[in-house]
Swiss-Prot record:
Catalytic EC class: lyase
EC number: 4.1.3.27
Residue span, Glutamine amidotransferase type-1 domain: 13-204
Organism: Thermus thermophilus (strain ATCC 27634 / DSM 579 / HB8)
Pathway: Amino-acid biosynthesis; L-tryptophan biosynthesis; L-tryptophan from chorismate: step 1/5
Protein name in UniProt: Anthranilate synthase component 2
Oligomeric form and interacting partners: Heterotetramer consisting of two non-identical subunits: a beta subunit (TrpG) and a large alpha subunit (TrpE).
Residue positions of the active site: C91, H181, E183
Length: 204
């Protein structure tokens, strides 16, 4: 079961930023099964100040069909609130984190649409306690390259042309990104990744 929320709440409140993607509610379902209370906001239907009023325990930025800078408030939200709230970005959300800290998002060397890849990792962050590699489903045509100094790559896929970044964490903030889809039923460790995010001991 997920840890209790802040400020005496019995349930952990998770703001889910929906980038207009069909996978969002699979993530919402997983969060609910893990004992959290997901609250879904569309990426262009809120103001940043409303995040402070909600005061969530965690923020999850969903996958989506566009680029990070077309994803509503996803990038500005990371830039403003990464020091204050734990954030997990999934697929487009991962790219938004990369862009927010100065990384470059470019067309991926291989188009991935429902393909399963072995994901290698170093066991840190949301990958704590997972086998390496583990199979995960990928749906993406973009990838983060030239990862900024603030982010540490902790997961990758071995491609014909080299490694593709599949995950990173911030050096100082509780901010994590995964390029693959943990909510896919073919991603064996998906729910454990979300559980690790919810149970991160970071407190503000």
């Amino acid at each position: 079961m997920a840890a209790n929320g802040a400020k005496g709440r019995k349930v952990m409140r998770v703001l889910v930023v929906d980038n207009y993607d069909s996978f969002t509610y699979n993530l919402v379902q997983y969060l609910g099964e893990l004992g959290a209370e997901p609250i879904v906001w569309r990426n262009d239907r809120f103001r940043l100040e409303e995040v402070e009023a909600l005061d969530p325990d965690r923020i999850l930025i969903s996958p989506g069909p566009c680029t990070p800078f077309e994803a509503g408030l996803s990038v500005p939200l990371v830039q403003r609130y990464a020091p204050r709230y734990p954030i997990l970005g999934v697929c487009l959300g991962h790219q938004a984190i990369g862009a927010a800290f100065g990384g470059k998002v470019v067309p991926a060397p291989v188009l991935m649409h429902g393909k399963v890849s072995p994901i290698h990792h170093d066991g840190t962050g949301v990958f704590r306690g997972l086998d390496s590699p583990f199979p995960a489903t990928r749906y993406h045509s973009l990838a983060v390259v030239e990862v900024p100094e603030a982010l540490v790559v902790n997961a990758w896929a071995e491609e014909a042309g080299g490694r593709t970044v599949m995950g990173f964490r911030h050096r100082d903030y509780p901010t994590h990104g995964v390029q693959f889809h943990p909510e896919s039923y073919l991603t064996e460790a998906g729910k454990l990744i979300l559980k690790n995010f919810l149970e991160d001991p970071w407190t503000r």
